[in-house]
Amino acid sequence: RDRSPSRGLGDVYKRQDLDIDDFKQLKPEDYWYSVIYGEGSCYTGEDIRKRTKKFWIWKDNMSWKIEELRLYFKDMQTRLKKDHPELFLCPDLSQWGYFLNVYSQKQCDSDNPDYSELWDTAMRGIDMYAISPYVDSCHFITVPARPDASPDAYVTSCQHSMMRVMNEGKECIGGIYWGRYIYRDLYAFLTPEEIVGTMTACGVDGYTSYGMNGLDDGGVLNRMEDDFLDSLRRGNTWCAEVIPKRGKSKFKEIAILFPSEMSDYEPFDVENNEIRRLDMLGWYEICCDLGYQTDVISYHDILENKLNDYKMLIVPSNDCYFAEEHTDMEKMIREWVTNGGVVLHGPDCGLSKNCFGIQGIPCEKTPYIYQKPVIPQGCEFQRYETGRCISAYADDAGKCIVMQEIEKGKVISCGVQLGASYVAKNIPHVPYEQRNKEMYPIIQARSTLLEDLLGVCGKPVSGICERGIEAGVFETGMVLVNHRSTPYEIGNLKGNRKFTNPVNDTVLLPHSAVWIERE
């Protein structure tokens, strides 16, 4: 599996220190990771940074699995459709999400053994974006929980954004887990109608669910309380009425580049992997909270010239970007930027280095300034020597965020992982060296930094800019979902309303949804 014709088996032999010239000379102890390093072992972050043989063998093993699975689906599509063209191919590609999986190794206790290899799709050898052409609907089950199993409806929203992209021009069948989750009672914090609202806002044509029964995985929907079942009934009744009115034409504003290489090759066990995964989720939440219509696209979509549908491309953390060649994609991104597109990326970004020659310099974890001091979070920190300074590190430690204009377009380079900072589980203390200065993490700084960064590509079509309020904008109207624990006032919005749980025409209850039809 190789994205560039310039790479061949000679490169594979070289990076694995193999002194051979014929593939048939290979033995399992030459190329198979578990034979060489033992079952259950994993490479480290140091192996990534130093591009060691250990990393390359893992990568090449996973590449083979991914390509074999892609070829399997391609072959099965041909076989099944040949004799039964009426078949609708919609396999469940994953039981527990994609990329934003629960890191169950940290959740298991004496009652539950460690199933982390089953849950983490980075251990599976699967690229769902690559499989999507061979099914009628590319589909998997989502769980509204972060890697630490804490409830988060935006995880389901983000993964349905992926599915919407995978199924452009086709039926989009969503997937959700209902019931008492094995690691956390998710629906004690979320409601079914809220999640149905999120899937509807993401553009699904319908959905399938998991959790009807089976105590081994939680679920047991038949054992859930009446308030859960009532909420599920309200959500299903609502979406059955709204989806035909809503249609399929969802607006597009911002694209987030799915970190395919990290998804393919880097499991949770690599240090700080969880933070890097959360960086993508954090950027998705930022975009939603600021009202933008956001899609998580892959390099496959850029190669199909779909980047022209968007105003901004956000590149989240991806320390495995170097593991594949991206010559054609990078050329297309450069052309898109020169014609007016905006790229926003974080520290240690291989894409910005290859596309634009922009490379940060590693630096200490230091507060940065935008209107007021902000405490940094994340695991990567860099400063930049060139570009117009948008935010500087405190104590003259250099430029933290810079912007460079490239013909009609712009590149915004961030020295901190703003996405990971936005969804960090904990908030930090003021750094000791800052003594008694007043400063806060980005989520509490009351700075307009994030709004101003995304505002470079224009104002959101939704007109909504509220944390915890998700908006899905379609040609015929808008779906609003209230993820907050407090009601949201919508009296200023025009259009006929259809609530999942109505009280009057102006109040959207916590953890519920509304369809507002365009007048």
How should each PLM-predicted stretch be described?
Residues 188, 317-519:
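A conserved amphipathic helix/loop scaffold
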Residues 191-235:
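Helix-enriched interaction subdomains in cytosolic or periplasmic regions
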Residues 94-102, 158-191, 214-222, 258-265:
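Active-site clefts of carbohydrate-active enzymes
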Residues 51-71, 95, 112, 141-152, ...:
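The substrate-binding groove and active-site-proximal loops of carbohydrate-active enzymes
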Residues 1, 7-158, 162:
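Polysaccharide-binding and catalytic clefts of secreted carbohydrate-active enzymes
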Residues 85-87, 167-170, 338-342, 409:
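A short helix->loop->beta-strand "cap" motif at the edges of active sites that frequently abuts
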Residues 89-91, 138-140, 172-176, 206-210:
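Hydrophobic faces of well-ordered beta-strands that scaffold small-molecule active sites
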Residues 204, 221-308, 474-476:
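Aromatic-Pro/Gly-enriched surface loop or interdomain linker
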